[in-house]
Amino acid sequence: ITIIDKDGNGGQPFGVAGVKVICNVFVKYSYAYTDRDGYYSMSKKFSSKPRYRLRFKNKEGFNIGFNKVLVSASTSALGKGPSEGMDVTITSSSERKLWCRSVVNNAAYDYIKRCGKEDMDIKVPPKNLRIWIFQNMDSSSAVMMRHGAFIDGSLIAKFLGDYASLVKLFLPDITLGFKGKTAYSTLYSETCHELAHASHFAQVGKKYWDKYIEF
């Protein structure tokens, strides 16, 4: 599973890293996580063409999308493919949700991988981080509600508008407003900016964050 940033890597495909690949034929089901370069290998064999999909639940401990009861993260269908495996290359011309989710996935994967002492040496964001993408908003935030931050209802309404009640019900940690934004570098950098706030939250804790978020 690869992606192309036309302005980076010489325009050549590179992996969608750590994402969950699911395939099934009727009730037969298997899944695997991609490696850094986008390769994956299913533990089960299929005799006919299975349906493939990406579920944006990353092996590095973050999920993209709503935390529903039965589905833990957003899912993008890839269609039927060969039983021996399906190759997919995602570009900015692909279905927009798939493109945005894949860029955010890579940004979060890279950020978390680089938090160690041998690289950036900063606090890793909390595990089970919940990231939401809003296509009709242009601002982003690190509300950290799934991890216990208490945000005043009026502040949520002011910032998130019509989405406020949804946010209070499903409790995201990071919200990304991607209205009018498409470039890989733009989506990537905005995601990393909010992840830096999540690292700050992991460092200072909930009580500080409840006050800090107002600013």
Give the label of every model feature segment.
Residues A142-G205:
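Active-site scaffold of zinc-dependent metalloenzymes
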Residues C23-Y39:
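Short, acidic Ser/Thr/Gly-rich low-complexity loop/linker segments typical of extracellular
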Residues S43-K45, K59-F62, T89-W132, S141-H147:
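Zn2+-dependent metallopeptidase catalytic core
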Residues K59-D87:
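Structured interaction patches on ligand/partner-binding surfaces of diverse proteins
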Residues A202-F215:
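Post-HEXXH active-site segment of zinc metalloproteases
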Residues I1-D7, G38, Y111:
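A short, amphipathic beta-strand motif
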Residues G15, S41-R51:
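Short Pro-Gly-centered beta-turn/loop motif in secreted/extracellular proteins
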